[in-house]
Amino acid sequence: METNDLGFVASLMFVLVPTVFLIVLFIQTNSREGSS
């Protein structure tokens, strides 16, 4: 089975984008709680 580069990139982004979003959100809440 040949690997489809476009499909691979699409699945990578599909997993990566929400993960990065959650990490950034988590860091922002932590810094807000720490500063206040």
UniProtKB/Swiss-Prot annotation:
Keyword Transmembrane helix part of the UniProt annotation: yes
Membrane disposition: Single-pass membrane protein
Pfam family name, one: PsbM
GO biological process: photosynthesis, light reaction
HAMAP family assigned to the protein according to its UniProt record, in alphabetical order: PSII_PsbM
NCBIfam families (alphabetical): PS_II_psbM
Functional note: One of the components of the core complex of photosystem II (PSII). PSII is a light-driven water:plastoquinone oxidoreductase that uses light energy to abstract electrons from H(2)O, generating O(2) and a proton gradient subsequently used for ATP formation. It consists of a core antenna complex that captures photons, and an electron transfer chain that converts photonic excitation into a charge separation. This subunit is found at the monomer-monomer interface.
Protein's UniProt name: Photosystem II reaction center protein M
Organism expressing this protein natively: Synechococcus sp. (strain CC9311)
Gene: psbM
